[in-house]
């Protein structure tokens, strides 16, 4: 059904700047880039901004930013269709002169009446070519009189057939097509006119786009031919569905690249996940580097069936990248989330009293990154290592305050930690267990409140690793703060939501049992 491409290509990604870059659009861009990278050629970025009412310059910038963030590199562009309006009008005049297009003076009211009549008959509306037979003299007179008109393409007779890279052989009968509009009454181009003119001028050889454009292709092929252009090879990707198996929408959660970026997903993970959402590289591996994906990519392994956007699977994949990326690659993506916590790596934090210690930051990241799912969670669990004070969950303070002997036990532990010659995890564990034994309590009676004191959470990595990384000064400061909170629990306790979201970051998720899309 499909075919392999082995020669250099010219592909394009052509979003409309009417909103944030959707994950479906990002996946289309990824497949175009992978094809270009795998066989050579050029990747063209084109902004289809001829819809004056809905297009937004800010969205044009945002789309470019989102593409760059996810790691997509284009070779040419961005080209703006709004800067090529004269070219579309010029090509429209050529079609009129060649008899491949004609002026239509039918009013919207007339067309609506015809559409209603067709609906009443239970038929799909096709423009009845009312104006096709007008002679040149009448057309000239009506144009001279200032009567509004559109320019319609004269569709050829017969079926339109083509081979789709994803779907195989396609056949559209003539009764499914009509003479569509090329230029509106204000001379602005429709999508059909601008996209075909651009693909010809930009020498596009392969058009890989969403299946929502499949019905446009039988219109575009004869237009390519009428304009003297080489018809590109087409491939139409299936839609991405939500968990309800309906078209992915806001009700399914974040659907734009920008939203997922803000939630703490890494670009490497999102690229990897979207690439596998409709493409099967073969084998069982799901974590693939960009180099590996380029080497493995082939359009004959693109799936024609819709893929379901599985947020759980994306979250798992993100956790794998959080665990494995070199810190030099990870830290630039983490910095904005540290800033949200009042901490700025390399420039000090809101209450850190100076620059963040790079060694402690690196150690804290290493300790926690295998236990979190997103950059947001990682920043939340790293923040206590650099804060002067933490907000403790009110229920934890209430529980600790109910134990009349706990404050004394913690105070004794605090003094022993302060006098330790070597502040290592082995020495810390030995000292805590010694204090517990001397005071006739179990070690757990000290471990749980100590963890809360230092992290604001009751879950996390091994406690003594945490204390060693945090260091003597910060650890003693947090123990002092918890002791102060126990003396005045009502005044010092904060709502549970004020602390780090440790419950969401306590354990790495297992990979869900689902296909690669």
State the predicted function of each range:
Residues 57, 61, 70-71, 80, ...:
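Conserved nucleotide- and phosphate/pyrophosphate-binding catalytic cores
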Residues 11-17, 45-49, 202-207, 255, ...:
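Glycine- and acidic
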Residues 2-120, 216-229:
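N-terminal Rossmann-like or analogous alpha/beta NTP/dinucleotide-binding catalytic cores
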């Amino acid at each position: 059904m499909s075919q392999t491409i082995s020669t250099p290509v010219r592909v394009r990604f052509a979003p409309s700047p009417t909103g944030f870059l959707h994950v479906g659009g990002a996946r289309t861009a990824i497949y175009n880039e992978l094809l270009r990278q795998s066989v050579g050629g050029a990747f063209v970025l084109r902004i289809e901004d001829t819809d004056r009412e809905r297009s937004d310059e800010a969205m044009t910038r945002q789309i470019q930013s989102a593409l760059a963030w996810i790691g997509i590199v284009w070779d040419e562009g961005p080209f703006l269709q709004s800067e090529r309006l004269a070219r579309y009008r010029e090509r429209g005049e050529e079609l009129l002169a060649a008899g491949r297009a004609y002026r239509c003076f039918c009013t919207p009211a007339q067309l609506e009446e015809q559409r209603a009549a067709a609906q009443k008959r239970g038929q799909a509306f096709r423009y009845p070519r009312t104006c096709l037979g007008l002679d040149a003299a009448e057309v000239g007179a009506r144009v001279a009189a200032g009567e509004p008109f559109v320019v319609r393409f004269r569709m050829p007779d017969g079926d339109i057939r083509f081979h789709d890279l994803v779907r195989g052989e396609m056949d559209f009968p003539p009764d499914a097509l009509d003479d569509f509009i090329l230029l509106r009454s204000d001379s602005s181009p429709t999508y059909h006119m601008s996209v075909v003119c651009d693909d010809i001028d930009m020498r596009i050889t392969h058009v890989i786009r969403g299946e929502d454009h499949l019905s446009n292709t039988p219109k575009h092929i004869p237009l390519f031919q009428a304009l003297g252009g080489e018809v590109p090879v087409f491939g139409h990707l299936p839609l991405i569905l939500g968990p309800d198996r309906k078209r992915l929408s806001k009700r399914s959660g974040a659907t734009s690249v920008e939203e997922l970026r803000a939630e703490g997903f890494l670009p490497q993970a999102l690229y990897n996940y979207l690439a596998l959402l409709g493409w099967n590289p073969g084998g069982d591996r799901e974590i693939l580097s960009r180099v590996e994906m380029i080497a493995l990519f082939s359009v004959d392994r693109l799936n024609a069936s819709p893929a379901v956007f599985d947020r759980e699977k994306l979250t798992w994949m993100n956790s794998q990248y959080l665990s494995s990326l070199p810190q030099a690659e990870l830290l630039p993506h983490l910095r904005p989330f540290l800033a949200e916590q009042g901490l700025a790596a390399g420039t000090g934090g809101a209450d850190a009293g100076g620059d963040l210690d790079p060694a402690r930051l690196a150690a804290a990241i290493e300790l926690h990154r295998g236990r979190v799912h997103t950059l947001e969670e990682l920043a939340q669990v790293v923040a206590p290592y650099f804060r002067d004070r933490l907000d403790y969950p009110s229920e934890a303070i209430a529980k600790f305050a109910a134990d009349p002997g706990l404050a004394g036990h913690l105070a004794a532990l605090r003094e022993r930690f302060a006098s330790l010659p070597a502040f290592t995890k082995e020495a810390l564990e030995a000292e805590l267990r010694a204090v517990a034994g001397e005071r006739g309590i179990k070690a757990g009676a000290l471990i749980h409140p100590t963890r809360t004191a230092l992290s604001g959470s009751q879950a996390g990595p091994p406690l003594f690793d945490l204390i060693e990384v945090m260091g003597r000064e910060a650890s003693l400061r947090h123990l002092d703060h918890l002791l102060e909170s126990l003396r005045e629990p009502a005044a010092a306790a904060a709502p549970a939501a004020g602390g780090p979201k440790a419950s969401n970051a306590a354990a790495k998720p297992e990979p869900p049992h689902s296909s690669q899309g």
